[in-house]
């Protein structure tokens, strides 16, 4: 989304606020919501966006099947009499089952079904603390009157865990476990002028897709709490710090001026890597020239100095001045 929806811009200045502007259930295993956080100072949106994205994809716990035990099976690609799918296919299907658990402990579940019939998630005998999100998720097809017995291990964790081949023994097969309940996260940053047009502000727009075991709103809450917990040690350290002399602290933490400049420039590049040059509102000539030299974001533009632009063929002084003026006006920045 490159164009700013003016209806989302807060009507009055003040503290940043967070709200859901769209929410829908696309299927039992796909929930979608869109949020905005605004108004923010220039640079704050990307900082928050990066932290929240990491927390949403890596910190929120989810529940899934991590191991399946079959009777008289020794290899993942084995087939079973009367079962249409191979063991490998059943493992893949089991991996996709979306579950929700109130317990953090590893638990067992069972499938014990006589065919012929189709086996779905609703046929899993689950502990009382675990529920299935989509009962019709396919697991296997029994083509004749035989019994399918599978013992399942269910765990709750965060992130992703690869299978351990060493555990392929005694009919036990581990699967690649995708614990995160978040399917996808997108965010974009949009700049707008304050009401008196004296300063630029930012709006952070967030889109979240979940697997149905958690709503995007709940995910935002969990990710926020996780992110806040990261900074608690700094608050606790304040109570425990020793009584150093102010001048000693200042001297020990001081950076050489040249180092400070480099650090500041690197911070700016990271901050503006998601802000596109469209926000500068340049003339077609200046805009097209920047695109031609692969300058797509403000971060890309910071790789060039004023002299670099002036020396480029077919790039006039007027266009350079326009870029410098737009950078200063919208972001309070100058090229080296």
UniProtKB/Swiss-Prot annotation:
The keyword Transcription applies. It is found in: Plastid, Chloroplast. It catalyses: RNA(n) + a ribonucleoside 5'-triphosphate = RNA(n+1) + diphosphate. SUPFAM superfamilies: C-terminal domain of RNA polymerase alpha subunit (SSF47789), Insert subdomain of RNA polymerase alpha subunit (SSF56553), RBP11-like subunits of RNA polymerase (SSF55257). Gene3D superfamilies: 5' to 3' exonuclease, C-terminal subdomain (1.10.150.20), DNA-directed RNA polymerase, insert domain (2.170.120.12), RNA polymerase, RBP11-like subunit (3.30.1360.10). Its EC number is 2.7.7.6. One of its GO terms (molecular function) is DNA binding. Residues 267-336 are annotated as: Alpha C-terminal domain (alpha-CTD). Its main location: plastid. One of its GO terms (cellular component) is chloroplast. It holds the Pfam family RNA_pol_A_bac. Residues 1-238 are annotated as: Alpha N-terminal domain (alpha-NTD). GO terms for biological process: DNA-templated transcription. DNA-dependent RNA polymerase catalyzes the transcription of DNA into RNA using the four ribonucleoside triphosphates as substrates. The N-terminal domain is essential for RNAP assembly and basal transcription, whereas the C-terminal domain is involved in interaction with transcriptional regulators and with upstream promoter elements. NCBIfam families: rpoA (TIGR02027). This is DNA-directed RNA polymerase subunit alpha. It comes from Huperzia lucidula (Shining clubmoss).
């Amino acid at each position: 989304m490159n164009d700013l929806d003016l209806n989302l811009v807060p009507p009055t200045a003040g503290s940043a606020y967070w709200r859901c502007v769209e929410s829908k259930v696309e299927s039992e295993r796909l929930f979608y919501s869109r949020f905005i956080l605004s108004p923010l100072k220039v640079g704050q949106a990307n900082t928050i966006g990066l932290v929240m994205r990491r927390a949403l994809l890596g910190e929120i716990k989810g529940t899934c099947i991590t191991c399946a035990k079959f009777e008289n099976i020794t290899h993942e690609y084995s087939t079973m009499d009367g079962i249409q799918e191979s063991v490998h296919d059943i493992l893949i299907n089991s991996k996709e089952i979306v579950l929700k658990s109130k317990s953090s402990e590893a638990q067992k579940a069972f499938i014990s079904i006589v065919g012929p019939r189709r086996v779905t998630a609703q046929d899993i005998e689950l502990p009382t603390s675990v529920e299935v999100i989509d009962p019709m998720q396919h697991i296997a097809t029994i083509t004749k009157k035989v019994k399918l017995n599978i013992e399942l291990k269910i765990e709750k964790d965060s992130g992703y865990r690869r299978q351990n081949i060493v555990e392929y023994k005694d009919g036990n097969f581990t699967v690649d476990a995708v614990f995160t309940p978040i399917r996808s996260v997108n965010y974009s940053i949009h700049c707008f002028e304050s009401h008196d047009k004296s300063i630029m502000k930012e709006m952070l727009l967030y889109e979240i897709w979940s697997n149905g075991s958690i709503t995007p709103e709940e995910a935002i809450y969990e990710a926020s709490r996780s992110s806040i917990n990261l900074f608690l040690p700094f608050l606790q350290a304040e109570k425990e710090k020793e009584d150093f002399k102010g001048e000693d602290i200042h001297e020990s933490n001081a950076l050489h001026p040249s180092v400070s400049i480099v650090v500041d420039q690197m911070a700016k590049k990271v901050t503006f890597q998601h802000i596109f040059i469209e926000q500068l509102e340049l003339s077609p000539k200046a805009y097209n020239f920047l695109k031609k030299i692969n300058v797509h974001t403000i971060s890309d533009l910071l790789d060039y100095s004023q002299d670099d632009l002036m020396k480029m063929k077919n790039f006039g002084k007027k266009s350079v001045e326009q870029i410098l003026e737009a950078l200063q006006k919208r972001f309070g920045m100058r090229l080296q």
